[in-house]
Design a protein with these regions (language model features):
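Signature of uroporphyrinogen-III synthase
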Residues: 1-229
Length: 229
């Protein structure tokens, strides 16, 4: 029997190795911002998520930029689908990975459109390196409390083998509800999300690579190990 996996990210995903049910823990709400705050030209535009691409797309025509950097293979794939040329994508799919491998020069003007709750590591690190950074809050994330309760009920009836978390926002939404401590079913897609879960007092497994495919591989490996296969 395939492992039953509850996936909590906002976009759907399927994998033949497991039985997936999507239970998004957060929803995104568009925010208003004054587009007059945008400069006419940037050296770099940075997208750190698929949502950033989706919410900023209507504003692309208002600016000119020389090059585009993205975080994550899924973000790049969405850009490719929308005919947006990507110039740089780090091999480590995280803000830290982008900073450590970044091609920006001191004095470059960089625009980062993202969520209101986005981590500030990248913008702060770039500023400290002498790069001019503008951060725009395009949207915010809010918990979906009915989804949190649905997962808690499923856990109570032992009808799940794994629960996955693809963002710190989703982790906060769920673990702040004080779910049971079950070290065998919580899985994180990346080190930053895993760190958030651990800071909230819980343990989890972490995907080897920051992709959904890698996380499913980790789930299957752990399921076979636990079953003694």
């Amino acid at each position: 029997m395939k492992p039953i996996v509850l996936m909590t990210q906002t976009h759907e995903y399927q994998d033949q190795r497991v039985a997936i049910k999507h239970v998004p823990l957060i929803e995104t709400i568009a925010l208003d911002f004054d587009d007059k705050a945008l400069c006419p030209h940037y050296d770099w535009l940075i997208f750190t998520s698929k949502n950033a691409v989706k919410y900023f797309y209507p504003y692309l025509k208002l600016i000119k930029y020389d090059q585009l950097a993205v975080v994550g293979v899924k973000t790049k794939q969405l850009c490719d689908k929308m005919k947006i040329d990507v110039d740089f994508c780090p091999t480590d799919f995280s803000q830290e990975g982008l900073f450590n491998q970044h091609p920006f020069k001191k004095g470059d003007r960089v625009l980062i459109p993202s969520s209101r709750q986005a981590r500030t590591f990248l913008q702060n690190a770039l500023k400290e390196s002498g790069i001019q950074v503008t951060k725009i809050d395009l949207y915010e994330v809010q918990p979906k409390y009915e989804s949190i309760q649905e997962i808690l009920d499923t856990m109570m009836h032992r009808q799940v083998d794994a629960i996955t978390f693809a963002s710190s926002s989703a982790a906060h939404a769920f673990f702040e509800a004080k779910p049971p401590h079950n070290e065998n079913i919580y899985f994180a897609i990346g080190q930053q999300t895993a760190q958030t879960i651990r800071k909230l007092g819980y343990s989890c497994f972490v995907a080897e690579v920051q992709t959904l495919e890698s996380m499913i591989t980790k789930i299957v490996e752990k399921r076979f190990y636990n079953d003694g296969i």
